[in-house]
Every structure is written in structure tokens, then in C-alpha cells.
Amino acid sequence: MYMSTDEIRRAFLAFFESKGHQIVESSSLVPANDPTLLFTNAGMNQFKDTFLGIEKRSYTRATTAQRCVRAGGKHNDLENVGFTARHHTFFEMLGNFSFGDYFKQDAIKYAWEFLTDVLGLPQDRLLVTIYETDDEAFDIWNKEMGIPADRIVRIGDNKGAPYASDNFWQMGDTGPCGPCSEIFYDHGEHIWGGRPGTPEEDGDRFIEIWNNVFMQFNRQADGTMEPLPKPSVDTGMGIERIAAIMQGVHSNYEIDIFQTLIKKSAEVIGYEDLSNQSLRVVADHIRSCAFLIVDGVMPSNEGRGYVLRRIIRRAVRHGNKLGASGAFFYKLVGPLAEIMGTAGDELKKRQALVEKILKIEEDNFGRTLDRGLTILNDALDNLSGKELDGETVFKLYDTYGFPADLTNDVARERDFTIDEEGFNNAMEAQRQRAREAGKFGVDYNESIKVDVNTEFCGYTGTAAQSSIVALYRDGEAVDSILAGEDALIILDNTPFYAESGGQCGDAGVLTAENTVFNVSDTQKFGAAIGHQGSLVQGALNVGDKLEAQVDVVRRTAITLNHSATHLLHSALRNLLGEHVAQKGSLVKPDALRFDFSNLEAVKPEQLREIERVVNEQIRLNHSIDTNIMDIESAKQKGAMALFGEKYDDEVRVLSMGEFSTELCGGIHAKNTGDIGLFKITSEGGIAAGIRRIEAVTGAAAIDALHAQEALLSETASIVKSDAASVATKVSALLAHSKQLEKDIQQLQDKLAAQESAGLLDQAKEINGVKVLITQLDGADNKALRGMLDEIKNKLGSGIVVLGNVSGDKVGLIVGVTKDLTGKVKAGELVNMVAQQVGGKGGGRPDMAQAGGTDAAALPAALESVTPWLTEKL
């Protein structure tokens, strides 16, 4: 039974919805609040905190069709993409999950039912693996599902340590783990390969299609396995693999999605042979590149942005290899959005932005691609061995933008390898970090864990009666603290807002009888809220009751700035376009910062219009309303979600009239009029395609305007003008200054010509060559260059060495007429002199310049020229 990829996706989600599972949308390819991951690479990523017990959800069963990327960091399939049947940078993982609900029996039953009943796969084509000692799973497969024992393969510890097995899954060195059961499809005897667990298992006959992970243990630091009180299930099935089976093909690249993209790639490149592997590379890479951009990643030279840039450039190089002329890659975005079906809805909304970013990146790389490939191929032609040195690989990266894996691709096609260690050493030596997967690593166990759910009551007030449920000093739990000690206090309820969504944490004071604790910051620790600060007087113990009082003045300033960011966000989208998406923010008492996606700098006139629109909304004094609703209703209302944030099923929707509607858990003003005034203080770029606006509100905005007025008044006074005419007066002064500089230069040129005529008499001959060596103090470098050209022209043939001292700086310039550059190079001569005055320089064979810092050494350095030239001439 043939099924399209989109039909399989729909059938899978509908099947598990019928089994009581909540359909959860694919999360962003940029993991939310998880620094341990470069990209989302599995369906369980968005549920990680739920499996760890840190986060609770309103459902215990879930199903997803998760977009994933594996390129960079630990999970890097990039170099194999296009050269094997099943490696991809982008793939979709179908999954069903149980959070302490059903376990092995139902997980296995559901998988079997979907594969055999819904998809209609023949049972004799399916084979399963289990962990060697998992008799429970064996009995379920054998006795309940009816799988013959000879089609159930036990896999033991095949990775050199206890529980180190292909069929035992673990999140890390410690934490949730358990056995897994994989389902394989047998493509038939006509394809080479052996069953799992045999030496031939890497063949293509038996292909894993579904993995069921049974999380039933909590691994301790000493290696012991403690049973989890509520075992869970995590499963994953690659949609491309099951689509190949349902469409009667063997390679993933033969399924409907890839065939469409391969044909479109050939069309835009102008290439006819659809079997070429480079077309596979292009077809795969457009998927990862397009969806990474949709999820907020922009091409750059670090982190996630650099991985995206590497993938784009690899695709462009393969298109170039097939004869592509001009930009072609961006033309595949439209076909991709159509063939992805329901999974392409978000891409359709942002198609124009994705196309624009890809075209700019492709055009930029195209300027250096041909030159870089020429250098690379020349280097390979001249190799005596089979390995390209790391310095050349680094030069291609540094000068021509060739990622090392792109260079490796070209080398591999010609049966060469690259010196990766040498490349990495060159990168380290120049302190350049192209790939830093390590910086995304963090140990969950290192953070403070508190099994407490602090009730937040700060939406309706700034004071509350609370009790201490935990105390931490230097990261360690303690029972009490004394005056003078810094600590973290966890309360049962609090009006203090913990830093989240860009809004900084509250400050204030916790008090009891004869006891004062100053709170400097408030942070989240799981579901607990921690108050960081110091005990000024008294002592505090776990269980003590106290009064929590937020700094109201500071809180009010923060709320004004936070509400202003919402107005700014909407103004940017209205004026610049819907491609604008928030990439980060910081809301402090004294200012706000807002980062957003935009390919170009915001023009001054656009900034003025943004300010005008925001201030207009402030004057309209909209009521700022909050409503709690389910996430789907919020989206239907048009509420904007913030980049990098995770949301519960029920969300807080904040509205400012019809102008702004966003999901937000922060604290805001009551009315937009409370903001008073909004003033932008700066705009600039912080990364490729990411801009930053900084602004102030209220009293701080008035202060900023006063500061500008004072500066304008001071400038007017300096130029002897009134404020209204200062621009005209400054323009006139600059024009006058420019004319004076021109007049001075003309005079200097005349003086140089006159002086150079007199200097010709000082020229001497060394072995038949005219040589002029002299020091001219007071002349600047520009004057020296003019004199050099004048003297060289009058000499006809000869060598000129001029030096000057200006303050404590030495200037040197050397000229060699072209008939003598075969004997004397200007750069070599100027460096010989420069080294003696504490400097260095360079230039062409006929003209070179240098600088130095040892003015006293200049006379002796110039005297050394004569013997040096005597040897050369």
C-alpha cells in the first residue's frame, strides 16, 4: 500500500491521538532553554525536563512529528550526506511518549498495531531486537504479539562496559535510562547485509525503523541502577525510512520528498543526470537550511550560525560542481514548502525571508568560491603524498570562507585526505573558534535542584507573608544562615518575579523580627523561586516565617520598560515586515534592549517612525490586559510567541488594544500611558541578520532628551551659533576646513618638488647605480610619497631611501626603479632599516613603507643602507 510522506505523518499522529495521546507540535530546531544541545536531534528533546521530573505537563501521553538536525557537535552526519542511502542533515522523527503512564506492554502493542494494521506491513518482514536480559520485553513480543523467537534478537553489552549496548539507552552518565527494543524491516535476500548483532549488520538488508526506549532505571554516580517510581516510554521512527518502505524503494533519496527536490535541483542548476550524488546533497541541504532559518538561526561565523553557513556553502559547492551559474539554492525553498505538506506551513509563512537570506549568503560565497577552488585544486595537484596540510586548509577557511568539511569533500573526491589536527592547531593559534560544540555542554546535576513549587503571587501585589523552605550557601543546602553571609533563600510563596523572558529578577527585602535579608536578584530553580542576596542582621532558619517586600520603585521601572518592548516589537513588525522576530531581550529598571531578525540596518528615518508609532500607542493609553487560555486559542488570536521560550498548554496572553498581542509571563504596566515616553538610544548589528535596539522610557527618556539638548547647546556655543542653525554652521566649517586642507596639500606638494630638486645633488653612486639616502624631519608620510615619486622620475634609474621623525614616530619609504627590482626589492630594504628602529613594513618590489618607534636610531639605520646595497649591487 503506497503512502506519501505526508499521509504517513498524518496517519501516525491520528493513530496515537486515538490512543489518548496529546498531539504536540514539533519544537524549534534550536532547543529551548537547553544548553546541552546544539540542535534538536530527537523527538524526546522537548520533553527532557519532563522525563527528568523537573517539569510537569497536563498530559501523560504525547505524540509528535519532530523536525531534527544532525550536523555539528556530537551528532554530525554532514560528511556522509549524499554518499549513503540514509544519512541526512535534516530528518523528521515520529514519536510517541509516556510520562509515567503506560509502559512496555502498551508501547510494544501500539508499535506493532500501527506497523501491521495501519501501514499493512507483512509481519514476516519485521524483526525485533531487545536488551539481552530484558525477558519482560521478550515475553511481550513472543507470547502476546506472536513474534517467533527466531525473529527476536537479544543484544548484550557490545560497547565494552556494563549497560553499554546498542539496546540500552541512557541520557547521560547519570539519570534516567533503560533497555530499548528496536524494530527492523527486512528488505529481502537480494540486498546484502546480516541480522542485527552479526558481523554483517551494517549492510542494507535489515534497516531499523522504530526504537522503543523503556526508561525504568535511575543510574547513580556509583553505577547502581535504581528503579524509577514511574517508568516512562520514549520512541522514535524516522519518517524518511518508513516512507521508503511504504513507497517500495530502498534508498531514502528515492521517496517522494527527495525525488521532487532532486528534480527541482536539477532544473534550477541546469543538470540532467538525476542519479548524481551532488543533487542528493543539494536536496538534503535545502531542508536543513530552510528550517534552521525558520527557527531563527542566521548564517554567521560561530555556533549554530556557522553550522548553517557550512551546510549552505557545501550545497553551493555541489551545485557549482554540476555547472550552476549564479545563485540557485534559494529557488528550492518554494518547492520544499509545498512537498513538506503540513510540516511546511511555517516555512510557507516565511518563504520570502528564507529565500532572501539564502540568496545573500550564496552571492557572498560565490565571489570567492571559484578562486578558492582553484587554489585548493592547485594544492592537491602539487601534493607529494595523499594528505593536504592543515595550514592550507586553514587558509582556505580564513581567506575564502571554505569550511574544513567542504575542503574535505573536494579532497575526498580526488582520493585525498586533510590534516584535521593541523587545521585545528591553526585555528587555535589564531584564537578563532568556528565550531565550539563543547560550549553547549552542561551537567544538570551541577545546578541547584529543589523539589519545591514556589507559588508566585507577584501579579497582584508586591508584598506577602512567606515561609523559608530551603536555604543554600555557596551552592550547598544548609539549615541556617547568619548575619554577613550571602545566601539563596527558597520561599513557599513570593511576590518576587524570577528572571524570565528577558525581564530581570526583582530586588527587595525579606524581613522578620530583628532580621533583614537584602535581595539583589531573583532566579528560577526548576519550579522553585530563589532569592539571592545577603543577611544584613539577625539569623534565619529553614521554616522561619518572614515578610517579602519587592522594591516597588525598581519593579515599576521594569514594568514600564517591559511593556515598551511589546510596543516596540509590534511597531517593528508593522513597519519593517512580518519577518521581524524577537531574538532576545533584556528588560532592566534603567533601560531596555531588544534583539530582532532583520537583514539590513534600520535607517534613521525608520527609527524616527518607530519612535513615533510607539509614542502614539503610549498616548492612546491602551489598557494592558491579560488572559489565560490554551495555546491553540492564543495562536488563533494572533498572539506572538517569543524565540527560545517554552510554553505550557495554558498560556498567559497579554494585549495592548488591537496593537499588540503576545504570550508573556512577565509583569507589566496597567496602561500604555504609564510608560510616559519612549526614546531609542542606539541601533546596531550584533550578528549576521540580527539587529539590536536599545531604548529608555519614562523619566530616563526625559533625561536622555535633556542630555541631547545639552550637547546641542554646547556644540552651538563652540561653533558660535544658535541651536536652530548649528547644522548649517557645522557644514560650513567642515567645507572651509576641507578647502584649507586642499590648499595646504598644494603648498606641501610645491615645497616637496622644490626640496626634491635640491636633494638630487645629494645622490651618490654605488657600483654604477644612483642612490639617494636622506632624513627629512617635519614631512608627513603623504609628503614623503610625493617626494619619492618626484625624485624617482628625475633620477630615471636609481634607489631612494627617505626617513623622517614626527614626535616619537619614525617613518620610512623606499623606492626602486623597475629596472633594478631584479637586484633590490624595496620591501626587503625597508624591513632591514625598520628592524633597526623598532618597526616593520612592507610593500611592492618598487615601493615600500615602514614605521618605527626608536627615533634616536634612525641616523645609524640610514647609514647601514650603503654597505647593504654595496653587497646587493
From Swiss-Prot:
Swiss-Prot/TrEMBL catalytic activity: tRNA(Ala) + L-alanine + ATP = L-alanyl-tRNA(Ala) + AMP + diphosphate
Chief location category: cytoplasm
Enzyme class: ligase
Keyword RNA-binding listed: yes
Required co-factors: Zn(2+)
Molecular-function GO term, any one: ATP binding
Name used for this protein in its record: Alanine--tRNA ligase
Record-listed E.C. numbers: 6.1.1.7
Subcellular location field: Cytoplasm
